[in-house]
Amino acid sequence: TQHKLNLVDDYRLSSFWIFVDNVARILTEQYGQISVFEHGAFSDASSTSCGTVHAHLHLVPISFSLVDESIQYDKNLNWQHCKVAEIKDIAGQKEYLFVADRYASQETTGMIHVLDMGVSQFFRKVIANKLGIPNQYNYRTNPMHESATEAATQLREKTQSVISSEL
């Protein structure tokens, strides 16, 4: 496998969507509706990668429109409608933010903003702001280990139950 900083090429692969579909199904069964987002970095040194320096897609169970909240959070950003498979064509070699309120596999449609410069933890800031805890967005200073551990335990149990039922 090849190390990647973003998922622009993977969004066009059926094998990628088989994996994500399984994860999304488990998350939806456990928590309900999920939103999707990616901080699309193109450089190891970019603040957009949020320190992870690995491509990753966020599937997050939330009860509000992350698209609407993202647009409202910073009205200076130029958002446009986009299917995930179109991200590469729209962003080119520039960094981007992508967000969708509904997961629909490779047909997932949301909004994209092509960045002029890197931005760190944008969607964490949006979510924390909406939840009324705007100063707790930073995972470095507020890692929320208890919530993460609880979710990991729930998902481990759910995944084991799904695997057992499919055998």
Which residue stretches match the model-derived regions?
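HIT superfamily nucleotide-processing domains
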Residues: 1-167
